[in-house]
């Protein structure tokens, strides 16, 4: 899916309560974790909120347009978030991280099973401890409603 034009009005379509719920859930379960990588960050909403909580955040997306919006939001909200354009199927980190997030159905865009496996392998290798990985949290929340 191309986010070229969509990136600039994406936030107006998203429910802010979902973001609030994500942050509350993350804060309750892994509040002591300081280094965070977000895969598929979109316009950076979660990354910005985590940075406000004092986390060291690297936010990534494959869409340059989403990252452009995220860059300006970081400036507007006066937060320091490292933004990087990467494919979540092909990433490596210089130092291991406390937490890796992949939210808002981002993993659903990886349709090849081999690539999905690669995302999990890369994630496993990038974590200090393999005890927390939040993937597609929205599905868990929605599933409870059925």
State the predicted function of each range:
Residues 45-90:
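Class I SAM-dependent methyltransferase SAM/SAH-binding core
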Residues 103-105:
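Residues lining the SAM
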